């Protein structure tokens, strides 16, 4: 969440930065400040009354010693009344704080000054392009046709099992998916210096709040509604991304400065209830409710936040370069950024069968927005102060769309798919053949 002190001290700056998102969130600032002022006023009055109660209580003993019992009883009544008022003020302050913090959770992060101003994806500036679009001397197939011809995915049976938006990988398709997962994890762990973790696939509500998924995007999550432990029903969720558990690993902790940066990579399936647009994207693999992803998370010193973001983007780019895929990197404009992000780069891979770019990685620096929600801090060595680190997240990468781009790019005239060299040891083959 945003720093309350920043809202008080630089109110117009906060409003101006929020306004660049074009979502109307700046309108919430006045309400947050009003609740904050109500809380502070109640606490200030309560402190004054506590001091008065203490001094009055001391007077009572002297009055009793002087046998001025009527006056002592009057003072006792005054102390009781002060106590009742203090209790009332404490309750008012607590209610105002709860309402203020609930509103704060609904306000997104402030875009970094380097982020381009814009309304939507059409305003996202292109940063760089790698490689050339695949060209063919034959009429290429799209991924749905390839998956059906090579029996990589059984779309019909996936839908039969779980409904639309769910995939059943089969044969070479299942093996290719597993090969990609292992390749990605090994690359990030061995070459890029990330520590691999294997998180739970069900997370608590506090984890979703910590990364900014909740409360705003609660309707896009799959909640666990039944089970043996009735106390958790409706409070546990299938993870929408491994960011939810992995970024929260050190919540409520104070790390040593020398521990930074902390870098994790994790594989997980991801579950999202959001609906896709009708058409090939819905029928195929472009928009699905469950997909695999390797997530990258960094906890870094604020001074290194943006340097580490550039490194993370290059880590994700390496995946596509090794697999021989054409892609571009774009910088999301203020109106297209995610809720918790201060700056985001998207990496979009070219899918020749779709004739378009597909997002396979989104890398963001959330600055201290998430660490404040998690109360994750580090102790600065120079003065012992506890500070909030920057939290970075990125896809390294998402698998479904990577799968699409790979099979469409590396298809061959005979209908087979050439396996990129880095995947061959994992797959045990250099070609995925036509199904018999």
Feature map (PLM): residue ranges:
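N-terminal alpha-helical targeting/anchoring segments
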Residues: 1-134, 152, 156
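TRNA-recognition modules of translation machinery and tRNA-sensing kinases, especially anticodon-binding
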Residues: 129-436
């Amino acid at each position: 969440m945003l720093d309350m002190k920043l809202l008080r001290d630089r109110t117009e700056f906060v409003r101006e930065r929020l306004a660049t998102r074009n979502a109307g969130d700046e309108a919430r600032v006045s309400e947050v400040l009003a609740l904050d002022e109500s809380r502070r006023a109640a606490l200030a009055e309560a402190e004054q009354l506590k001091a008065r109660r203490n001094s009055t209580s001391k007077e009572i003993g002297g009055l009793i010693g002087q046998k001025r019992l009527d006056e002592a009883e009057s003072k006792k009544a005054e102390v009781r009344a002060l106590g009742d008022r203090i209790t009332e003020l404490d309750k008012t302050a607590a209610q105002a704080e709860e309402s203020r913090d609930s509103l704060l959770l609904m306000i997104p992060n402030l875009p970094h000054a380097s982020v381009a101003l814009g309304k939507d994806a059409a305003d996202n500036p292109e940063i760089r392009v790698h490689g050339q679009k695949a060209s063919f001397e034959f009429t290429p197939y799209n991924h749905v046709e390839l998956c059906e011809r090579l029996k990589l995915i059984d779309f019909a049976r996936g839908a039969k099992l779980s409904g639309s938006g769910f995939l059943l990988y089969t044969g070479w398709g299942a093996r290719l998916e597993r090969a990609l997962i292992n390749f990605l994890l090994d690359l990030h762990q061995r070459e890029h210096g990330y520590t691999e973790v294997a998180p739970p696939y069900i997370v608590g509500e506090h984890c979703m709040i910590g990364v900014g998924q909740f409360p705003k995007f609660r309707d896009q999550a799959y909640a666990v509604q039944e089970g043996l432990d009735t106390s958790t029903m409706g409070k546990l969720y299938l993870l929408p991304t491994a960011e939810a558990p992995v970024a929260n690993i050190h919540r409520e902790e104070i790390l040593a400065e020398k521990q930074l940066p902390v870098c994790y990579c994790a594989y997980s399936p991801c579950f999202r209830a959001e609906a896709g647009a009708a058409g090939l994207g819905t029928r195929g693999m472009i928009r699905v409710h469950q997909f695999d992803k390797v997530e990258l998370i960094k906890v870094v010193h604020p001074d290194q936040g943006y340097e580490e973001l550039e490194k993370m983007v290059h880590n994700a780019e390496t995946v596509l370069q090794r697999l021989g895929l054409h892609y571009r990197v774009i910088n999301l404009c203020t109106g297209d950024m995610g809720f918790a992000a201060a700056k985001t780069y998207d990496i979009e891979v070219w899918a020749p069968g779709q004739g378009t770019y597909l997002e396979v990685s989104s890398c963001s620096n959330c600055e201290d927005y998430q660490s404040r929600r998690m109360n994750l801090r580090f102790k600065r060595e120079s003065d012992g102060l506890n500070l909030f680190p920057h939290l970075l997240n990125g896809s390294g990468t998402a698998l479904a769309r990577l799968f699409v781009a790979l099979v469409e790019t590396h298809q061959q005239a005979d209908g087979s798919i050439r396996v990129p060299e880095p995947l061959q040891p994992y797959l045990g083959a250099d070609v995925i053949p036509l199904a018999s």
